[in-house]
């Protein structure tokens, strides 16, 4: 199975937990306990049955994966990405996007000058932050708000940025 545009990243396994095969997962769902609620998860090669044991801080969960029964097996899953078919997810409003949909979008200034490419979307607790890699090789971060990103066109895979005044160098 290949991971393509029809799959959405819901989480990443970042550590083993305990000796009975549990793992810690950084989730990208609104409610971390929903990581396994949308349907079968896959890493691209196999389907994984995930059961959430507990929610811990910063959008993370401790989970059990069927067939993983010891710490060594759990440690082997570190950095494994967990995806779900987008057809299993709820429909979004017009101004909502999944993180994976934004990564790779071309970013332009209002005058159509290329500003860069979206390389990552973070959420440190106070809102989404978009990381953009510029043609000069710099990485810039901006709050993901409608004032800064007034236009997003998923058909053309482009978004418009109006950088805040304090960034001055982009005028």
Swiss-Prot record:
Pfam families: PRC_RimM, RimM. Signal peptide: none annotated. Residues 94-168 form the PRC barrel domain. Transmembrane segments: none annotated. It is found in: Cytoplasm. InterPro entries: PRC_barrel-like_sf, PRC_RimM, RimM, RimM_N, RimM_N_sf, Transl_B-barrel_sf. One of its GO terms (molecular function) is ribosome binding. Its main location: cytoplasm. Gene3D superfamilies: PRC-barrel domain (2.30.30.240), RimM (2.40.30.60). The keyword rRNA processing applies. Keywords: Chaperone, Cytoplasm, Ribosome biogenesis, rRNA processing. GO terms for cellular component: cytoplasm; ribosome. The keyword rRNA processing applies. One of its GO terms (biological process) is rRNA processing. Binds ribosomal protein uS19. Belongs to the RimM family. HAMAP family: Ribosome_mat_RimM (MF_00014). The PRC barrel domain binds ribosomal protein uS19. An accessory protein needed during the final step in the assembly of 30S ribosomal subunit, possibly for assembly of the head region. Essential for efficient processing of 16S rRNA. May be needed both before and after RbfA during the maturation of 16S rRNA. It has affinity for free ribosomal 30S subunits but not for 70S ribosomes. This is Ribosome maturation factor RimM. It comes from Anaplasma phagocytophilum (strain HZ).
């Amino acid at each position: 199975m290949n991971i393509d545009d029809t799959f959405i990243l819901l989480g990443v396994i970042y550590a083993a937990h305990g000796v009975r095969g549990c793992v810690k997962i950084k989730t990208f769902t609104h409610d971390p306990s929903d990581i396994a609620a949308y349907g079968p998860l896959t890493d691209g090669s196999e389907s994984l049955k995930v059961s959430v044991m507990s929610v811990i801080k910063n959008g993370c969960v401790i989970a059990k994966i069927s067939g993983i029964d010891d710490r060594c097996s759990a440690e082997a899953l570190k950095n494994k990405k967990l995806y779900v078919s987008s057809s299993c997810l709820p429909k979004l409003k017009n101004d909502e996007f999944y993180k994976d949909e934004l990564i790779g979008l071309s970013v332009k200034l209002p005058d159509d000058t290329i500003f860069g490419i979206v390389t990552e979307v973070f959420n440190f607790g106070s809102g989404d932050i978009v990381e953009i890699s510029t043609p000069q090789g710099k990485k810039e971060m901006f709050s993901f708000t409608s004032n800064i990103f007034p236009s997003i066109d998923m058909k053309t895979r482009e978004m418009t940025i109006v950088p805040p005044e304090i960034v001055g160098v982009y005028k």
